[in-house]
Regions:
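Acidic, Mg2+-coordinating phosphoryl-transfer loop and its flanking beta/alpha structural elements
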Residues: 122, 127-155
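Flexible loop/turn segments at secondary-structure boundaries
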Residues: 42, 68-71, 97-100, 127-130, ...
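Short, acidic loop-to-helix structural element flanking the phosphoryl-transfer center
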Residues: 5-61
């Protein structure tokens, strides 16, 4: 509370006020990072589009509202098999101290990068990734997150049966497979279909 665009270290500094030891804090913070790295999965259609744009010589920026710092983000990208761009092409809210949801990061982007050029942003948050960029003349393309795809699919009822952390993890693993592609529901009117036996299993 009271910490805007905080880094993970700043967040855990606040948690330390609950009288946890430095060792406890370090262990819990590392556990959070390890779990995120283990569970993080690239959305292949979007990752492939990103790689294609790089191959075509396009300037691509990765912009995220996130409490992980640059090295952690690069570790996540590497784990997911995504080409890591130069540091200046990764904008993270906790390091920039401005963000997508408030729109402040788009103001800076439009002044430093997007001036007098055509830009397209792709994201899954209607406010931070669509409405706010538009205020600064930045075009956007909205894709649904896997969670939003679930809630707009024929399997939406599953969400009401999530009662525990284990349930949440299991559902996350399911939707990461079913809705890895943000276009998975485009031709089915929201009905979930299985293209191969691995996904069905």
């Amino acid at each position: 509370k009271g910490v805007s665009n905080a880094t993970i270290n700043e967040i855990y500094k606040q948690i330390k006020k609950t009288n946890l030891t430095d060792t406890n804090i370090a262990d819990i913070m590392q556990l959070e990072k390890d779990i995120d790295i283990d569970l993080c999965i690239a959305r292949r259609d979007i990752a492939d589009l990103y790689e294609y744009c790089l191959a075509c010589g396009k300037k691509v920026y990765l912009i995220s509202d996130m409490y992980y710092k640059l090295q952690d983000i690069k570790h996540l990208l590497d784990k997911c098999g995504v080409t890591i761009p130069d540091d200046e092409h990764i904008w993270i809210s906790c390091e920039k101290k401005c963000d997508k949801v408030s729109g402040s990061i788009w103001k800076e982007y439009s002044e430093l990068v997007g001036k007098d050029i055509k830009c397209l942003h792709i994201g899954d948050n209607k406010t931070g990734d669509v409405e706010n960029p538009a205020k600064y003349g930045i075009d956007s393309y909205y894709i649904m997150s896997a969670k939003d795809m679930l809630m707009n699919s024929s399997m939406a009822e599953l969400a009401s049966h999530v009662n525990t952390v284990s349930d949440s993890i299991c559902l996350g693993l399911v939707i990461s497979k079913l809705f890895n592609s943000p276009f998975a529901l485009c031709s089915t009117n929201g009905k979930v279909s299985y293209d191969d036996s691995e996904i069905y299993g």
